[in-house]
Regions:
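Early extracytoplasmic/domain-onset interaction patches
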Residues: 21-82, 421-449, 482, 486, ...
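Secretory-pathway-linked proteins and extracytosolic
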Residues: 22-28, 148-160, 164-308, 424, ...
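Solvent-exposed beta-hairpin/edge-strand motifs
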Residues: 24, 80-110, 168-185, 461-487, ...
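Cysteine-centered nucleophilic/redox motifs
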Residues: 64, 139-141, 174, 293, ...
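Surface-exposed, acidic/Ser/Thr-rich flexible loop segments
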Residues: 76, 81, 125, 134-189, ...
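A surface-exposed beta-strand-loop module
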Residues: 92-162, 192-229, 432-436, 484-518
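Hydrophobic/aromatic-rich core segments of domains that either
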Residues: 331-421
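Long hydrophobic segments that form regular secondary structure
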Residues: 411-511
Length: 631
């Protein structure tokens, strides 16, 4: 389910009310030096003025002034806006200024590229896009535009002017004007600013200001932006949307409205009901019935995104999903819910955000979720079903939802629950590598790997590809020059969590370097990503997920050698994980064993030295070679 795009904005009615010196804000040399250091662009002004005229009508004006310092910042000067049924882009003006603040070019609404075409099959959103650039840097662009909603709205645009990396903010202003008796709620995250509130005739005006916000330098294992960036969310306590009305004063009230949208959407034709019973009536176990219907859903339907009808919030009726053989996350989840209900199994419609793990418990807004799954309560353990991708085993909690908060619908409303996540030790890679090196130094390699749980997710569906598509994927995993892949075998194993077995053979004439008396052998055949930390750590260290990697490498040699040099045996443990490595020579066979475990979680920035040392030790290991001397 697409995030509701009721946002984005319009012309500020009076530019002088937003900043007192328009010329200054357009000149590059007037920027504080602190805002220019290490960035590609500076938001000089991000001013939003939203007026809720009534529950059906809202106008949002926006003025965005961006100084682009170099080519990396050019994208931040482009204009993009989305509208949908019930909203429209009314005005647009873009002006380009040189470094001294002199006007060089003006564009308007007639220059826009507006398209309703998208990758989705059914979508009533329109994308409006326009690029405005200069061949010389720096330059400044001022955009002014207006979006109106005339048939109700469910969200009020947020105030989120700050960027995580690369872009600093000089000044952000947000003004919300409402009738005196209009009720709304707001939630500030990562900020303590309070609004300035005034009464102007019959209207209430609330104003928020953010100033001088510097971005962070890109660093390893940065926390999720939503947990760091200051932003404010808004929602109307009551709303009218697509000819329906509801309340958003709490999740319980919002849940009642969404629950009403689900009623009557679980209908099945008699033929479809008969099919459900033909699949399940001979299956004695409840869980096996669920698995059978889950598999049937995947075999008989395919996923498409559908953003029509009530802004994409109401699912397609279950009988239509089965008849047409298509559905989005809402429709497919609701369809499986209907089939389960037909055979006496109750389930819950669930909304979750695949990008942001958190849902604010004290602010109910549709924009906080963007996806729908299904929950089947069970005494033996609840099943969470991803209906858009049945290549996942039934009940498997994939990485885009594991540990996220979700809205679970039951008994006429909704409540927040946290979706479980798996322990790090369940995410595993087990690798066995056998290498034969001939007298000319050519390497012949056989690899057998097993990927389990989260580590298997990137490989699901790979078995359906042709070998021509599989080869570059495998080569991208390897650090082997002049690698020729000879054979590939991929198997997806039917277990409770994703399990993929991958084996292949390859060869290389120069993976090993050789001279008359010595061989220089890398410590690993695999590409190993290194964590690059800044010299000074500003934020806590957040490792998104953990895993265990076990690797055993056996190398058969053509002649007798002795080990002249190698990476020392390693055994390291820290708050971020552990690493052990040993290398030995037995006759003409080298045995190298490595086990690395990474622990997910958030560590205080004061631990950066310990964690940096841990990842640095691993990087140092991969960079070393085993040096053998011919006897």
């Amino acid at each position: 389910m697409k995030r509701i795009l009721t946002t984005i904005a319009a012309i500020v009615l009076c530019a002088s009310a937003s900043f007192s010196q328009p010329k200054r804000i357009l000149q590059t040399f007037t920027m504080p030096d602190s805002l220019k250091q290490g960035v590609c662009a500076v938001i000089r002004l991000d001013s939003t003025a939203t007026e809720c005229h009534s529950l059906k009508s809202m106008t949002t004006g926006h003025m965005l002034v961006v100084t682009v310092l170099n080519s990396e910042g050019a994208d931040y000067g482009h204009f993009i806006e989305y509208t949908s049924e019930g909203s429209s882009l009314r005005q647009l003006k873009g002006t380009l200024y040189d470094a001294s603040g002199e006007k060089r070019r003006t564009v308007g609404k007639g220059d826009l590229i507006s398209t309703e075409q998208s990758a989705e099959m059914a979508d009533d959103y329109t994308t409006h896009y326009l690029e405005l650039t200069s061949p010389t840097y720096p330059y400044t662009i001022c955009w002014e535009w207006e979006v109106t909603h005339s048939d109700g709205y469910i969200s009020i645009p947020p105030f989120a002017p700050a960027h995580y990396v690369g872009v600093s903010l000089e000044r952000g202003v947000y003004t919300l004007t409402t009738p005196k008796d209009y009720k709304f709620s707001f939630k500030g995250a990562n900020t303590s600013i309070e609004p300035q509130v005034s009464l102007q005739k019959e209207k209430k005006v609330s104003k928020w200001v953010m100033e001088g916000i510097l971005p962070y330098r890109k660093d390893a294992f940065m926390p999720h932006p939503q947990s760091i960036l200051p932003h404010i969310l808004f929602t109307p306590d009551e709303f009218i949307y697509h000819k329906t009305s509801g309340k958003a004063s709490s999740w319980e009230e919002y849940g009642k409205w969404q629950w009403a949208l689900l009623q009557g959407r679980d209908s099945l034709s008699q033929e479809q009901k008969d099919l459900v019973h033909s699949i399940t009536d001979t299956i004695p176990l409840r869980r096996e019935k669920i698995k059978a219907l889950y598999r049937h859903l995947g075999q008989s339907t395919r996923y498409v995104s559908i953003q029509l009808g009530l802004g994409g919030l109401q699912p397609m009726a279950a009988h239509k999903v089965l008849s047409y053989g298509i559905g989005d996350c809402k429709g497919l989840s609701n369809c499986l819910k209907a089939m389960l209900k037909e055979c006496g199994i109750e389930s819950n419609y669930v909304e979750v955000n695949t990008n942001n793990p958190a849902i604010h418990p004290d602010l109910a807004s549709a924009s906080q979720t963007n996806h729908v799954i299904l929950k089947v309560p069970d005494p033996a353990g609840d099943l969470w079903l991803e209906c858009t991708n049945t290549s996942y085993p039934p009940g498997y909690i994939h990485s885009n939802i594991a540990g996220h908060h979700a809205l679970v619908y039951a008994n006429g409303t909704a409540a927040i629950e946290k979706i479980p996540s798996y322990p790090d030790t369940m995410n595993r890679i087990i690798s066995k590598v056998h290498i034969r090196i001939d007298q000319a130094g050519h390497s012949y390699i056989k690899v057998e790997e097993k990927y389990v749980n989260r580590c298997a997710e990137p490989f699901l569906g790979m078995a359906t590809l042709g070998i021509r598509e599989q080869k570059p994927l495998i080569q991208g995993m390897l650090s082997i020059p002049s690698c020729t892949i000879d054979s590939i075998s991929i198997k997806e194993i039917a277990t409770q969590v994703p399990t993929v077995e991958l084996s292949y053979t390859c060869s290389s004439p120069n993976w090993v370097q050789a001279n008359a008396n010595r061989l220089f052998i890398p410590t690993t055949i695999f590409n190993q990503a290194s964590a690059k930390f800044n010299r000074t750590r500003k934020l806590d260290i957040e490792i998104p997920y953990g895993y265990v990697w076990e690797n055993a490498m056996t190398i058969d040699l053509a002649d007798d050698y002795t080990i002249e040099a190698k990476a020392g045996d390693i055994s390291i443990t820290c708050c971020a994980g552990s690493l052990t490595h040993t290398t030995s020579l037995q006759g003409r066979t080298i045995l190298a064993k490595t086990e690395r475990s990474i622990l997910s979680g958030r560590n205080p920035k004061e631990k950066v030295g310990e964690i940096k040392g841990f990842f640095g030790a691993a990087a140092g290991l991969w960079g070393k070679k085993i040096i053998l001397k011919r006897q």
